Amino acid sequence: MFEIHPVKKVSVVIPVYNEQESLPELIRRTTTACESLGKEYEILLIDDGSSDNSAHILVEASQAENSHIVSILLNRNYGQHSAIMAGFSHVTGDLIITLDADLQNPPEEIPRLVAKADEGYDVVGTVRQNRQDSWFRKTASKMINRLIQRTTGKAMGDYGCMLRAYRRHIVDAMLHCHERSTFIPILANIFARRAIEIPVHHAEREYGESKYSFMRLINLMYDLVTCLTTTPLRMLSLLGSIIAIGGFSIAVLLVILRLTFGPQWAAEGVFMLFAVLFTFIGAQFIGMGLLGEYIGRIYTDVRARPRYFVQQVIRPSSKENE
């Protein structure tokens, strides 16, 4: 029987990248939600190398009177999950909640996650209801979720939703993992003894545009399999796929022509031989590309470069800056 420790302090970790329009509303609503908890709290906003005015807004928020905002400024853009890991390394709460800055997942859901964590769960995930994304984003998300479930064996419904709560020991365990590329929901579930998902509201994006373009989603899918971004090797795999599909299509066409018009249309089997050859060549390219992905991952991890570089940490005026 494990002792359930009540949540005493909540840390909200929010990565920010070019979100200057949504930041004032985000800070106001997140602060209001945290105040309603009746617990100690802090809000950590990580500027992931924004090129707009986001960093300046964060600094001003941290320096405001009675502020609970901790601003963490990275020197450049490292990506959503690396920015969150940077926030994890500075939290002081015993329950850590992650949240996107676009306000599509309302901060008002935070009390529900805290209440569920108080029931003894190590990880509280969320499933977006009535998603307000494009058809492409919804389809890509479903494909990624299925890929993760097949790869990890963890039957979670929505890995793409970053509105999640983690107990402190889960975050500490993740910080001890040193791989270069990290997908936090998967990593957390590796260490969680008890995990659960709850449905949450999903709103339309009011400010700016999604930071996940088509190519970023493709990269994310590859990273989930190999935990590395190596674009040239991926292009090799793509080339192999095209060749393999082309060879298979030719083979099907030749079979149809042979059955319909006789053996002379298939050049007495010569074209069929080429079709099979192209199929196998394509398969070899795919294998070489995937092998290259893993070799590239090993190379990157061996260099042991840090996931991110924190340029400055600005805490509320009552505390010293780092």
From Swiss-Prot:
List where in the cell it is found: Cell inner membrane
Q: Which Gene3D superfamilies match?
A: Spore Coat Polysaccharide Biosynthesis Protein SpsA, Chain A
EC category name: transferase
Q: Which GO terms describe its biological process?
A: 4-amino-4-deoxy-alpha-L-arabinopyranosyl undecaprenyl phosphate biosynthetic process; lipid A biosynthetic process; lipopolysaccharide biosynthetic process; response to antibiotic
CDD domains, per the entry: DPM1_like_bac
Those parts of the protein on the Cytoplasmic side are 1-235, 291-322
What does the record say about its membrane topology?
Multi-pass membrane protein
Instruction: Write out the entry's keywords from A to Z.
Output: Antibiotic resistance, Cell inner membrane, Cell membrane, Glycosyltransferase, Lipid A biosynthesis, Lipid biosynthesis, Lipid metabolism, Lipopolysaccharide biosynthesis, Membrane, Transferase, Transmembrane, Transmembrane helix
Q: Where, in residue ranges, is this chain on the Periplasmic side?
A: 257-269
* Keyword Cell inner membrane assigned: yes
- The domain of life is Bacteria
Any single GO molecular-function term of the entry would be: phosphotransferase activity, for other substituted phosphate groups
One cellular component term from this protein's GO annotations in UniProt: plasma membrane
Task: Say if the entry is tagged with keyword Cell inner membrane.
Answer: yes
Q: Which reaction does it catalyse?
A: UDP-4-deoxy-4-formamido-beta-L-arabinose + di-trans,octa-cis-undecaprenyl phosphate = 4-deoxy-4-formamido-alpha-L-arabinopyranosyl di-trans,octa-cis-undecaprenyl phosphate + UDP
- In which pathway does this enzyme or protein participate? Glycolipid biosynthesis; 4-amino-4-deoxy-alpha-L-arabinose undecaprenyl phosphate biosynthesis; 4-amino-4-deoxy-alpha-L-arabinose undecaprenyl phosphate from UDP-4-deoxy-4-formamido-beta-L-arabinose and undecaprenyl phosphate: step 1/2; Bacterial outer membrane biogenesis; lipopolysaccharide biosynthesis
Membrane-spanning segments? 236-256, 270-290
EC number of this enzyme = 2.4.2.53
Q: What is its main location?
A: membrane
> Which family is this protein grouped under?
Belongs to the glycosyltransferase 2 family.
Function, as annotated, reads: Catalyzes the transfer of 4-deoxy-4-formamido-L-arabinose from UDP to undecaprenyl phosphate. The modified arabinose is attached to lipid A and is required for resistance to polymyxin and cationic antimicrobial peptides.
What is the protein name for this chain? Undecaprenyl-phosphate 4-deoxy-4-formamido-L-arabinose transferase
Question: Which source organism?
Answer: Escherichia coli O157:H7
The gene is: arnC
